[in-house]
Regions:
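Acidic-enriched and Gly/Ser
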Residues: 1-118, 133-138, 142-161
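Short glycine/proline-centered loop/turn elements that form peptide/ligand docking sites
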Residues: 113, 123-125
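Short beta-strand-centered aromatic/proline hotspots
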Residues: 125-134
């Protein structure tokens, strides 16, 4: 089975996944757990890892295209070249944790006094070679990663250790 990426209308990712599952297509919109500060208190919330994108796991055929494309909210297949979208390779699929339906926990990050940091565990560890901007105060990490052949900025939650 290969994984493909759909661009969908932002806010309709879960609805698109539900509609695709009803049609027998394996679909995922990965969630992550993040800590958000509101009114002076840290609260835990589940947020989409990639707003505006849904991953579809299947072997690509013309029939699959005609099942998926008319679903309300689907805009286009990413990487559609020469009539067939580009599939994610196995390494990339594992990086986005498409093998499990679990919500991703925040990555644990060790911050040093000299301003450097080291990722101990969590989903951020899979993006070791990508450019990362760390915001310790907001407990966020922004990673520039490639998705469907285009560089995208992805936000991850972190827990300072």
């Amino acid at each position: 089975m290969k994984w493909y990426v759909l661009q969908v209308m932002t806010g309709s990712e879960r609805d698109v996944c539900t509609a695709l599952r009803r049609k027998g297509v394996k679909a995922r919109a990965p969630d992550q757990r993040m800590e958000i500060r509101r009114r002076g208190q840290w609260q835990t919330e589940d947020r989409l890892l990639l707003p505006g994108y849904v991953f579809v796991g299947a072997e690509y055929t013309a029939a699959l295209f005609h099942v998926v494309s008319p679903v309300p909210g689907v805009i286009r297949w990413l990487g559609l070249e020469h009539g067939e979208p580009q599939a994610l390779d196995t390494r990339e699929a594992l990086r986005w944790r498409l093998d499990s339906d679990e919500t991703l926990e925040p990555s644990r990050v060790l911050f040093h006094a000299d301003g450097t940091w080291h990722v101990l565990d969590g989903p951020l560890a899979a993006f070791a070679g990508c450019p990362v901007r760390m915001e310790r105060r907001q407990r966020r990490a922004y990673v520039t990663a490639e998705l469907g052949g285009v560089a995208r900025r992805v936000r991850f939650g972190v827990i300072p250790v």
